[in-house]
Amino acid sequence: MMDNDNQFWKRFLIFTILMFLFITAYELFYIYYVKPSQPQKTEKKEVVKKEEFKNVNLPQLMLGTFREKQEYKNTKTVKLGIYSLELSEKGGKILRFIDQKYGFDLISKAERELKIFPLEIFTGNPDLDQKLNFGEYEIKEGKNSVELIHKELKVKKILSYKNGAIHLSVEGLKPPFWVFVGSPPDDEAFYTHVGPVLKINGEVVRLDVDDLKGINEFEGNIEFGGEESRYFFKGAKDYQKHIVYKVKLGDKFVSLSTFLYDGEKTIYLGAKDYARLRELGLVDTLDWGTLKIIVKPLFLFLYWIYEHTGSWVLSILVLTFIVRIFLFPLGYKSVVSMQKLQELAPKMEKIKQKYKDDPVKMQEEMMKLYAETGFNPMAGCLPILLQIPIFFALYKVLIITVDLKVSSFLWIPSLADKDPYYILPVIMGLTMILQQKMTPSPDPKQALVGYITSVAFTLLFINFPAGLVLYWTLNNVFNIIQNYLIKEVLLKDKSKGGSKKK
């Protein structure tokens, strides 16, 4: 029966690794294969007349040779709050849009290759659209604002900065018309959604470009819509029609989003910085994933800690500590169960040797031993299983926290990137081995499985963002301290108390 218990713990360790891989795979499946429900149309008060709204022509983006041959030489760099924009006189185009806090350019490689840029205007009239998007503009800079004035048509695009966003108003051109948002920002996905995202009729819809048709229309109460990546979002707020184009670019497809302009709009091209998103009502652009019910509260709690500490490293430390305190009762039961298993090991070995030719009798004797000693083999497994959703939720929280991109730790320049010297993953692996040493298995084979697991996790985490590796390392350290306190303090005090009573 000793073999049965060893097999149980082997299976549990394998199960833990498989659970990690399963949740990761499920996240990817959810992102790329689960079809979102089609949003229902709702009525909303119109800024323009309903008839005009319905009769507006679909935008023709004029992609192709003519556009790709255009050159934009006369440019001007302007500052709008926390953003830096490079604007061209030809077409009044935004050639660069840099979020200065994160040093990130929101203009994607796809947009540069196609030579189509955010906030281009499309009326459905090809001649007018060509003049609007390729004519000459005067660039007039103001205080936290810039005016792009078409020299021939006298159409004026006014971009003004307020509360972390750009407010777009257009003069000299009667709405409704279409405004181009862009394609997804060039950001590493890392198990998060990249592509079109809308909050329409109260439901957040994330779309996979491979599932789209050539032209995809959405109509309803659209709170926000646009294109997203792991850390960045580009889109608009509060409108009623949205179109996503699926365009072939090289050997893959890319999505391009436009929205129907019916009056001044709030445009956001920037990081998914929670402080900004909260101010703008864009918090749901954060990709909470399938464990949203746990991830969102943990994220908000982590951010609350950060607001009071001012350090993301300290915030991760405090959050990990608090979670360990919360899970202490489960950890206590697990350690007690493991210690009980070690105490029973000699008796279990005797039963194994005595009934090695009679598995049924061996099973009966083992169950009798469990009943006499009050040992439950599942008692060590269940507490750990209950912790898994919380650990994976914390993992997701750290994946979507853009602030880690500009947070450093000792030799690591950014907690959002991997450790360039691989020191932290090695430390993490050593803490896992130390945990194995503190709770040794009575079976050498089982101990070997534990060490192999430690090495496997080290290799798995070696290219993970340093913030995740830091969290897992701190979690291991707190677990080591917890096990020490339980074994060397609580259980010894308990046994001393029992001896005194005798």
Swiss-Prot record:
Which membrane topology describes this protein? Multi-pass membrane protein
- Transmembrane region positions? 12-32, 286-306, 312-332, 382-402, 409-429, 452-472
Please name the InterPro entries in this protein's record.
Membr_insert_YidC, Membr_insert_YidC_N, YidC/ALB3/OXA1/COX18, YidC/Oxa/ALB_C, YidC_ALB_C
List the CDD domains hit by this protein, alphabetically.
Answer: 5TM_YidC_Alb3 (cd20070)
Specify whether Cell wall biogenesis/degradation is a keyword of the entry: no
What compartments host this protein? Answer: Cell membrane
Molecular function per GO: membrane insertase activity
Listed A to Z, the keywords are: Cell membrane, Chaperone, Membrane, Protein transport, Transmembrane, Transmembrane helix, Transport
Q: Which domain of life is it from?
A: Bacteria
> Which GO terms of the cellular component aspect does the record hold?
plasma membrane
Oxidoreductase recorded as keyword: no
The entry's function note states: Required for the insertion and/or proper folding and/or complex formation of integral membrane proteins into the membrane. Involved in integration of membrane proteins that insert both dependently and independently of the Sec translocase complex, as well as at least some lipoproteins. Aids folding of multispanning membrane proteins.
Quote the subunit structure annotation: Interacts with the Sec translocase complex via SecD. Specifically interacts with transmembrane segments of nascent integral membrane proteins during membrane integration.
Which NCBIfam families does the UniProt entry name for this protein? Answer: yidC_nterm (TIGR03593), yidC_oxa1_cterm (TIGR03592)
Q: Which family does it belong to?
A: Belongs to the OXA1/ALB3/YidC family. Type 1 subfamily.
Q: What is this protein called?
A: Membrane protein insertase YidC
Q: Which organism is it from?
A: Aquifex aeolicus (strain VF5)
Gene name, per UniProt, is: yidC
